[in-house]
Amino acid sequence: TLAMNTSFDLNNATISVNPVKTAYGYTGSVRDFKQGITGGVASYGDYAYYGDDTGILQCVDMNTMQAVWAIDLGESMMCTPALETEEDGGVYLYTGTALGKTGRSAQIRLLKIDALTGDIVWECQSAIKGKYASKDAKAGSYAGVMASPLVGEGEINDLIIFNVNHVELDDKSICAVVYALDKATGEEVWNQPLDVDSKSSPIGLYQRDGKSYIVMGDDGGTLRLMDGFSGTTLSTLNLGSAIQASPAAYGNEIVVGTTGGMLYFVELK
């Protein structure tokens, strides 16, 4: 955190700034991974939530810069957790794991966590096997949750949407798969393989009647419009280069960038 300690003198029309930086650090020996933070931070009140490449998800009080709780997810966490407050006053995180340079296949974990206690509410029981091609593969080949989950609204208010990269399917093919899980139980409602890898965070679009749509990109350069209730792909548009960032939307207008250095404006009709 950075306290700016500003002082404004109205009479002399001057302002002074005396910034004081407070840093939070920690050490761990859970796994032999680099202790980097790939994802972003979620926040609730004074609390900040983030995971690291060693698989430690933690809550830090931003006033005291002290850990409130920390849990070991067993594999790397590379996504920004999604946070939701429910009508009963509960505060929850949705997140998942990713495989580092292990050169192996392993189960990908999709979880709902109590944000105030760190207790695991549920873990998806679907057999989602992530496959890492080799220890020499590029970071883009990481298997697991690289994208932020989408907290459903409208007609999909009971769903949480995960984009899981580099999943090994029953026929041994590899691609990203979008999973819709029941927020209350973690049970799988639908899944949609994408045929290629994807690290793009899905966004939700909602009509006034609550009808829901999902927009996301993939490494093949395809911008995809999906039915949020069923997962069916309704329309696609290929932009020529990989889409790894999250699209931004306003009404029926979407802006998205590609790794080819282009920024596109797309209108939904």
For the regions a language model picked out, list residue spans one by one.
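Extracytoplasmic/lumenal domain signature
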Residues: 1-269
